[in-house]
A protein has these predicted regions:
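Non-catalytic DNA-recognition/assembly elements of restriction-modification systems
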Residues: 1-24, 154-161, 169-175
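Sequence-specific dsDNA recognition surfaces
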Residues: 14-25, 32-69, 86, 91
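Catalytic cores of nucleotide-enabled group-transfer and carboxylate-activating enzymes in metabolic
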Residues: 147-152
Length: 178
């Protein structure tokens, strides 16, 4: 393990987050439904959804809610960073492709979580755990649960997120100017 500042701790994703949690909601509520093709690649957290009744959106699908972070578990979507920070869903709930892994922890900065699972080390390590036939390979869920992350206090998570966003804004500005 690498050294972290004194007020940080090393934790495993599975001990910090609920992985693939379920939602309890009335079946007749409107909910989001997000198939894979409605999720953008490339660390943008851009997605769109269809509105369905909760009974249909949840049945046989991955469930998620406002505040969750979701990322693809199947190749090549995982490497392409098809991922999203879920917010402003109808009635704060949704269902979608079974090819997603969901992380939930309301006490961790959502953007910090998003950047952790977008990190090149996380992606490279996940690819090493692939199983299945070519074109249908998936990362091992145990890899996700056991992945070690440095966890700073919430104020430091926010500072890190702000710095990442500053750097991305510079990159986007530079690429737009070119």
């Amino acid at each position: 393990k690498r050294q972290v500042p004194e007020n940080w701790v090393w934790v495993r994703l599975g001990s910090l987050y609920e992985v693939n949690p379920k939602n309890k909601a009335d079946d007749e509520l409107d909910a989001a439904f997000i198939p894979m093709e409605k999720i953008s690649a490339g660390m943008l957290s851009e997605y769109s959804y269809e509105t369905q009744k909760w009974c249909k959106a949840k049945k046989g699908h991955t469930q998620f809610a406002d505040g969750d972070v979701a990322f693809a578990k199947i190749s090549p979507c995982f490497e392409n960073r098809k991922s999203m920070m879920l917010n402003n869903l109808p009635n704060s709930i949704g269902g979608g492709t079974t090819e997603l892994i969901i992380l939930r922890n309301a006490s961790i900065n959502q953007k910090y979580t998003f950047w952790l699972v977008s990190d090149e080390r996380f992606i490279r390590g996940g690819v090493q755990t692939y199983s299945g036939t070519v074109g249908q390979q998936r990362i091992n869920i145990d890899y996700v649960r056991s992945y070690p992350i440095p966890l700073p206090p919430l104020s430091e998570q926010q500072r890190i997120v702000e710095r990442i966003e500053e750097l991305f804004a510079c990159l986007l500005y530079t690429s737009d100017a070119a």
